[in-house]
């Protein structure tokens, strides 16, 4: 287990689920497009993700409509969409019946191995206390914020020349910041479509 610095109420073991469907098994579902500052250090252009918005919203069963307006010099009003999708329920049969997908359960990706420090030769996994090596032409690491960092950090620990030491892997992660912004009385005649919490 990793050491938690700061918020003692945060429990990393409950912030992600190691199960088929991942953290969507208990996520809140609040969704919105990323801001420019979210991908500042990524090898992406500002609008490169825009072409994927429609398909992403279809996957999440939400409308591709996100209003954003400026309230003042310091505050913006941002609209979220709520998704109740559980990926295990939605895609289980599709994945099991696919001829192009091999579903491997009860197996944990430990780290990537590279002998030339330029590309991944294979992924080393642990299954039933035995080591498995998985080779592929391409690897897409999509295990979520905590697991991606853990895998990359352990890969760097095994081979410090493969992953740049200066990359801020595993830094700046935090749990949902919750704040009680205020309490008010709602006029029933006004729009009451929003019924969630504020993150």
What are the language-model segments listed below?
Residues 6-12, 17, 62-69, 161-168:
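A short alpha-helix-loop-beta-strand transition element characteristic
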Residues 31-37, 156-161:
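A glycine- and small-aliphatic-rich helix-loop capping segment at beta-alpha/alpha-beta transitions
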Residues 1, 112, 123-196:
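Glycine-rich loop(s) and the adjacent beta-strand/alpha-helix scaffold that form part
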Residues 1-31, 45-56:
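N-terminal FAD cofactor-binding segment of flavoenzymes
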Residues 18, 25, 106-111, 125-129:
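FAD-binding core/adjacent interface of flavoenzyme oxidoreductases
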Residues 22, 105-106, 141-143:
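Short His-Asn-centered micro-motif
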